[in-house]
Amino acid sequence: MHPSTFVTTIACLAGLAHGYANPGSCSGACNIHDPALIRRQSDGKYFRFSTGNKISYASSSSIKGPWTVLGSVLPRGSSINLPGKTDLWAPDISLVNGAYHLYYSVSAFGSQDSAIGLATSATMDPNSWTDHGSTGIRSSSSKPYNAIDANLFHDGGNYYMTFGSFWHDIYQAPMNSAATAVSSGPYNIAYNPSGTHAVEGAFMYKFGKYYYLFFSSGICCGYDTSRPAAGKEYKIRVCRSTSATGHFVDKHGVSCTNGGGTVVLESHGHVYGPGGQGVFTDPALGPVLYYHYVDTRIGYADGQKRFGWNKIDFSSGWPVV
């Protein structure tokens, strides 16, 4: 066998071994953490939001880029009076009744004193955002959950907020008809009873008859100074249900409230610790899983994390990338 053919064959076999496609291309501003993605209704422009710089955001004509940074959603920080009000996390973006709703987290790393806030804009243009403060979803040490990592889901006229990180993991709460405030108490929809309960960053998406609950599990951050044991780093998992409010199970029928979760994407090749995900219906590509990841060819620091995306195949009833 010619040496070049041998190398190509080995590369192909390696690709089959991990089974995951490499991230789609990204140009322009591609360093990002906790991305949130939407396409503006009026002109089809893409907007991408992320943790840092009081919710940094960028725009592009395509999911591939080139991404151009526009600035901060809330340059003065949040009106929510909690530590971390000028260090906002984990944005989530939705179009609600003709306005763009940007949900954000106010907290300090490792703290349970947290809240989910809301900012709105009619256009998403720079300097067009209005902060509305808390949605009423808050947590403290007396609660079984941590009120961060919001995701709004709309189903048949009803809005639900899914949120949570560690502690008792993922909760869901009904929202009012304007999706501005919680309307009743939260309930648990995902929990890993083992270890440190390392589950967070949930995102709901409906395809066909199923509601899919995507979430990140494992250790998210600080890889440059303290690398977790192999397999303990971030990865993306999923459970599904025929109802927006549960009961979610994984591919083997294990309940998501009892440690269930089928792996959708994990470390492979030069991709390490993918997570902080969402799902977006692209007009050209169809369903797309987007996320952040470490490119091991570049570096492991949090500030070096990259924007990744892959097309999703739901033909088996489970998301495959």
Curated annotation (Swiss-Prot):
Pfam families: Glyco_hydro_43. CDD domains: GH43_AnAbnA-like. It is an enzyme of class 3 (hydrolase). One of its GO terms (molecular function) is arabinan endo-1,5-alpha-L-arabinosidase activity. It catalyses: Endohydrolysis of (1->5)-alpha-arabinofuranosidic linkages in (1->5)-arabinans. The active site is at D34, E200. Pathway: Glycan metabolism; L-arabinan degradation. One of its GO terms (cellular component) is extracellular region. This is Probable arabinan endo-1,5-alpha-L-arabinosidase A. It comes from Aspergillus clavatus (strain ATCC 1007 / CBS 513.65 / DSM 816 / NCTC 3887 / NRRL 1 / QM 1276 / 107).
